[in-house]
Amino acid sequence: MAVCGLGSRLGLGSRLGLRGCFGAARLLYPRFQSRGPQGVEDGDRPQPSSKTPRIPKIYTKTGDKGFSSTFTGERRPKDDQVFEAVGTTDELSSAIGFALELVTEKGHTFAEELQKIQCTLQDVGSALATPCSSAREAHLKYTTFKAGPILELEQWIDKYTSQLPPLTAFILPSGGKISSALHFCRAVCRRAERRVVPLVQMGETDANVAKFLNRLSDYLFTLARYAAMKEGNQEKIYMKNDPSAESEGL
């Protein structure tokens, strides 16, 4: 979300996921703050001592009725297409985070790329959480998704592809723990792209968001193959299951 972009400058980006950024938005921007239970005004609440720092709660209860806020302040059902896209992007970042732990344990140099991608996914969430139909120029100033990350992914893809043997058959998710984890990330990325495409077609988000996810799935596929090669693990090849061939051998 946009506040994640702001949060990265405040040191929040590395500690908050996409959901956490929604919470940070409520703290950083007054329009997101709830008035609390019906009939209770802020002035009626017990005030903390001036000597005790106020620790914000992670839960706000504002979403208990099945609605949540976009960055623009618009309230939408939690199963809205916008939140489906944001949530799947968050899931993708979590999957990459798991793969990154495995990558770091092995000391692979592409760990930095994966971490950078996680940060970029925060920006993707920013753009998605700012629907164009309700966004003002002030919102878009923080959340417009540029083409730079797409070009960077293409450079990384070309770098690894040049070191890999050409594909001569369909491969299955395999090649060791890291390779398999990256294939899982690729599958989640494809789902995130499918959630984003309708928003692009409706004019709710920039086409660069869908382009980035499309390129990211290619990167994750290439990186999975590269990881298998670097670790000396064999990739499993797809072989058609032909029952007739088995019966002929009887």
Swiss-Prot record:
Modified residues annotated as N6-succinyllysine in this record: 211, 230
Known partners and oligomeric status: Homotrimer.
Organism annotation: Homo sapiens
Disease: Methylmalonic aciduria, cblB type: An autosomal recessive disorder of methylmalonate and cobalamin metabolism due to defective synthesis of adenosylcobalamin.
First-listed, main subcellular location of the protein, grouped into a coarse class: mitochondrion
One MF term in the entry's GO annotations: corrinoid adenosyltransferase activity
Subcellular location: Mitochondrion
Function, as annotated: Converts cob(I)alamin to adenosylcobalamin (adenosylcob(III)alamin), a coenzyme for methylmalonyl-CoA mutase, therefore participates in the final step of the vitamin B12 conversion. Generates adenosylcobalamin (AdoCbl) and directly delivers the cofactor to MUT in a transfer that is stimulated by ATP-binding to MMAB and gated by MMAA.
Family as reported in the entry's similarity comment: Belongs to the Cob(I)alamin adenosyltransferase family.
Protein name, as recorded: Corrinoid adenosyltransferase MMAB
Heme in keyword set: no
Gene giving rise to this polypeptide: MMAB
Enzymatic reactions: cob(I)alamin-[corrinoid adenosyltransferase] + ATP = apo-[corrinoid adenosyltransferase] + adenosylcob(III)alamin + triphosphate
